[in-house]
Swiss-Prot record:
Keyword Ribosomal protein: no
Post-translational modification: Methylated by PrmC. Methylation increases the termination efficiency of RF1.
UniProt-listed SUPFAM superfamilies: Release factor
Alphabetized PANTHER family for the sequence: LD18447P
Annotated protein name in UniProt: Peptide chain release factor 1
Coiled coil: none
Modified residues annotated as N5-methylglutamine in this record: 233
Amino acid sequence: MLPQDKLDLILRRHEEISARLTENPDAATFVSLSRELAGLDEVAQAIRAYRDEMTEISGMEAMLADPATEPELLALAEEELQDARQRLGAFEQHLRIALLPKDADDEKSAILEIRAGTGGDEAALFAGDLFRMYQRYAEAKGWGVEILSVSEGTAGGYKEIVAEITGKGVFAKLKFESGTHRVQRVPDTETQGRIHTSAATVAVLPQAEEVDVEINEADLKIDTMRAQGAGGQHVNKTESAIRITHLPTGTVIFVQDERSQHKNRARAMSLLRSRIYDAKRQQLEAERAADRKAQVGSGDRSERIRTYNFPQGRLTDHRINLTLYKLDKVMTGEALDEVIDALITDYQAAQLAASEGA
């Protein structure tokens, strides 16, 4: 049975927040209430849909129990009642998922970091392929993509690329992409047709706002320098490149991609906030891991999560034993949702099983 008292409390809170937002609260309160309301919208809608269906079923059951109901209506009501009960089951399942504890960062934008791993030039090329896959996927979703930092590979692709992906719910969709991605294919430079294996690591961080992380300017060491090209030569005459070191954590951010020192500093600070926030998040996750029963993989970014086998056109996600023979569509971003949605569904199923067994 669903906890009706809890459902009542959620609806009352949803209505209370909606009312308070019409009273012109101060900016900080408005932001806080808006976030809370956004977190309750889905579950409030699910509760109302579930209860509306319950009301419909009660009405049909009363009609069937009424001896005055005309015979021709009885058959119609019985058929409609069966359909309504099926809909109710779907509404209840959706509501149970909506009631699961929410990741507070799910609605945030994200920082995407891709780094070439083992495999030399081929790893850098694969890192480039992965970035283009996520870029196309993001564009299809209507999200914004802005490159924050890039180090190009000698034969193409990227040794490292960091990008900001902005939009509602970006982190919820991409957070399970963190880990080691392995590729198996024949490089263009391979003359004997041998399959090579290389890898790239992906890290997806929730984008932190200033309200999420407080950074003391006294804790920062900021160096400016002239931006450098791939061969180490200076590419402009002004000291536009920025290196920020967060002394308490030792986190170092270097950004040189804009000609403006001001823009590079803003990008570096945004990335620094997200790195510090994510480090705290990872620490909390590690502390909870012993008690948490529902998890897709370990979340460890060194964990091999997926293999892309180009000769066979096969993608395998090792965490949920998912295999798709449509690698070309995954790499264009077209079929990536099939993988992501399967991971989310598996995670939610594990959460439901854990909550029901608690």
